[in-house]
Amino acid sequence: MNLLEPSSGKISIDNLPLASIRNAWQKKISYIPQNFYILDDSFLENILFSEDKKQVEINKVNQILKFCHLDNLVDDLPEGLNTIVGPSGKLLSGGQAQRLAMARGLYQDRDILILDEATNALDKDTEDKILKNILDLKKSKTIIIISHNQKVLDLCDKVIEFKGNKANIN
């Protein structure tokens, strides 16, 4: 994930200019976007994505599969985690692909988790279960949720609404 330069002013974190700590800061963030890229590769490769393939933590992968309610799907796949999901994940439903993207972000296990409309392709029941799991993470991570879904926003401790050039904290 790249960080954009501000059009004016500067961004500081703990009184340090973001530009001077950009690489360290980026390593603290997992970003789960609304529009994600699925590799024409295995389920496992899509979870690992840019992570070190030599250091696969299979127990961690299995925990994340359960967290994202993908464990039963993977168990039913002909080659399990080694099943090729097809170009752009065409062998997966929209909700399954979105949960795979979520598993990728969670595998990175970073301090800050940003979810950008990350549950919009999920059915209500699956969304409720995954949101519960995500909220359990707030004990150990900073979670930033970007959503237009009021039900999702109602689960947040703080809501910042952007309208025009103003940010309102509710």
Please identify what each model-predicted range represents.
Residues 93-94, 100-105:
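ABC ATPase nucleotide-binding domain "signature" region
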Residues 113-117:
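Catalytic Walker B motif of ABC-type/P-loop ATPase nucleotide-binding domains
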